[in-house]
Amino acid sequence: MCAPLEKDDIRRLSQAFHRFGIVTVTELIEPHTRKLVRAEADRLLDQYAERRDLRLATTDYTRRSMSVVPSETIAANSELVTGLYAHRELLAPLEAIAGERLHPCPKADEEFLITRQEQRGDTHGWHWGDFSFALIWVLQAPPIDVGGLLQCVPHTTWDKASPQINRYLVENPIDTYHFESGDVYFLRTDTTLHRTIPLREDTTRIILNMTWAGERDLSRKLAADDRWWDNAEVSAARAIKD
């Protein structure tokens, strides 16, 4: 499933992760495993995809336009994804990179998410994650000139009552990343403001997100009604009509 990494590789990845909030770990995952995950995501999208088009109050009304397969649907219908999520062969190197233990996500609706951006303008707008760590499998990526690139501002914090996203964008550099189909990256989601650049034309960008918690997350109280991927009718969401 996973290819072993040398100590020097782990050290290099860990240093980059703590500096930039993100590292590419494609070399950690065997190509055969990545192909299996791609086929599994396609199957789940074909059977269970739900469309979302909304703006979210807790991130200054940034946009969410994509199709999704929610976490609990994935958990109930994919032994492959749930098995990978709990596999020590995957968790051990990620924990070495993070420098701490990765705990199963304490909220079942946030363990997993499959998204498919497919229409011109589709985007996952500026946001943070409620929990500390995510492994993102880029299963299908558009060409670099079409959009869908990842942008990040590390070492930021999320105040849901006053996100101040534009202030962060003005006061900090924005790092931009292009990934090819099959790439995998590890992201510090709670302190890295991030988004995907909107698609310039109809095309396809598919990812699988696996989320883990840090020790600090286990006692957190999440009061905001903003879990849009699980329910498009949450109170923090404003539907996009156009």
Swiss-Prot record:
Q: What is this protein called?
A: L-lysine 4-chlorinase
For this protein, the record's InterPro entries field holds: BesD (IPR053701), BesD/HalB-like (IPR056470)
Keywords, in A-Z order: Amino-acid biosynthesis, Antibiotic biosynthesis, Iron, Oxidoreductase, Plasmid
Q: Which cysteines are joined by disulfide bonds?
A: none
**Organism of provenance:** Streptantibioticus cattleyicolor (strain ATCC 35852 / DSM 46488 / JCM 4925 / NBRC 14057 / NRRL 8057) (Streptomyces cattleya)
State the protein's purpose: Involved in the biosynthesis of terminal alkyne-containing amino acids such as L-propargylglycine (Pra) and L-beta-ethynylserine, that are produced as antibiotics by S.cattleya. Catalyzes the chlorination of L-lysine at the C4 position, leading to the production of 4-chloro-L-lysine.
Q: What happens when the gene is disrupted?
A: Cells lacking this gene no longer produce detectable amounts of L-propargylglycine and L-beta-ethynylserine, that are terminal alkyne-containing amino acids produced by wild-type S.cattleya.
Per the record, the similarity remark reads: Belongs to the alpha-ketoglutarate/Fe-dependent halogenase family.
Presence of keyword Oxidoreductase: yes
What EC number(s) has UniProt assigned to this enzyme?
1.14.20.-
